[in-house]
């Protein structure tokens, strides 16, 4: 009796066994959700083992390589997180001097430049991470090897005199709680600045709340977001906006963006229902 061969899709992939492609994309942190994964697939941006994959239902195995092609010119996928925030929050960038904390390769910095910032201080604890194309922009002032937790107005201005005019702060930090960094940022730029920060629950909850690198408990994620909002409030920064990041973190963690502004914000209590809805969506 002849051996039954696995069914082959119209893309030429054997589809027996394995996990759905859209599910795998979300599980591997390559897409925010199965819905966004399906959009990436439909756009022709996804390949499996180097071959174009056009169906969300395609079955893939753990050992197969899934890649999402870059569909734009940004130096990092983090750029799309800040774009989502600036599209949702009425934060003016044009004509302002911005401080990008945790600049890394420069995705946030790149977005700020494209939106008309007159100067961006790209600060990071690491060295030589900023993409050459971003570093080459004359409006960028690179500050490397500086831990934002210990930043002061004087120390930053000594390294970057242009920072004296900073009135917009964006932050994308890893391996440290925002609650530990916000006090230094407020002291450095003052309360009149707008703050747009990326909240990563995996760095806000304790180790006990993380399973295989992920914060899967909705209550813990909600506590993480609320905790950052209250930390900002205690420093004199009201909450003016909260949203879910359009992209998951590199390990698949859900992330969130918050806007703090003394001119437009309010007590975090007024945001509790929205935070809960966003986290549990």
Question: What would you call each of these model-derived segments?
Answer:
Residues 7-64:
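A basic, amphipathic helix-loop patch mediating RNA/tRNA/ribosome contacts
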Residues 93-104, 112:
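Conserved class I S-adenosyl-L-methionine
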Residues 104-109, 126:
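Residues at the N-terminus of the alpha-helix immediately C-terminal to the conserved SAM/SAH-binding loop
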Residues 111-119:
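Conserved S-adenosyl-L-methionine
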Residues 121-180:
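S-adenosyl-L-methionine
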Residues 179-196:
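A short glycine-rich, Lys/Arg-flanked "PGG" loop and its adjoining helix->strand segment in the class I
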Residues 201-217:
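Short, glycine-/aromatic-enriched active-site segment of Class I SAM-dependent methyltransferases
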Residues 254, 261-281:
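Flexible, glycine-/basic-rich loop-and-beta segments that form/coincide
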């Amino acid at each position: 009796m002849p051996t039954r061969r696995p069914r082959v899709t119209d893309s030429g992939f054997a589809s027996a066994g394995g996990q759905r492609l859209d599910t795998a994309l979300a599980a591997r942190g390559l897409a925010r959700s199965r819905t966004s994964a399906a959009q990436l697939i439909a756009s022709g941006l996804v390949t499996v083992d180097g071959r174009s994959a056009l169906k969300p239902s395609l079955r893939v195995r753990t050992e197969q390589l899934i890649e999402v092609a870059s569909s734009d010119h940004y130096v990092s996928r983090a750029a799309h997180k800040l774009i989502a925030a600036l599209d949702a929050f009425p934060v003016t960038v044009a004509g302002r001097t911005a401080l990008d904390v945790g600049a890394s390769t420069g995705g946030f910095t790149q977005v700020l430049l494209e939106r008309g910032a007159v100067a961006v201080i790209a600060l990071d604890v690491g060295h030589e991470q900023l993409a050459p194309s971003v570093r080459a922009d004359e409006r960028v002032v690179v500050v490397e090897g500086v831990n934002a937790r210990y930043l002061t107005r004087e120390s930053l201005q000594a390294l970057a005199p242009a920072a004296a005019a900073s009135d917009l702060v964006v932050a994308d930090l890893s391996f440290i709680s925002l609650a530990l960094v916000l006090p230094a940022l407020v002291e450095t730029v003052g309360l009149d600045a707008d703050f747009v920060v990326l909240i990563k629950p995996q760095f806000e909850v304790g180790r006990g709340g993380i399973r295989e690198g992920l914060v899967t408990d909705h209550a813990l994620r909600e506590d993480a977001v609320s905790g950052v909002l209250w930390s900002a409030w205690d420093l004199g920064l009201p909450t003016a906006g909260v949203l879910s990041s359009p992209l998951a973190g590199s390990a698949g963690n859900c992330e969130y963006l918050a806007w703090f502004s003394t001119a437009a914000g309010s007590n975090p209590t007024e945001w509790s229902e929205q935070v809960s809805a966003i986290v549990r969506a």
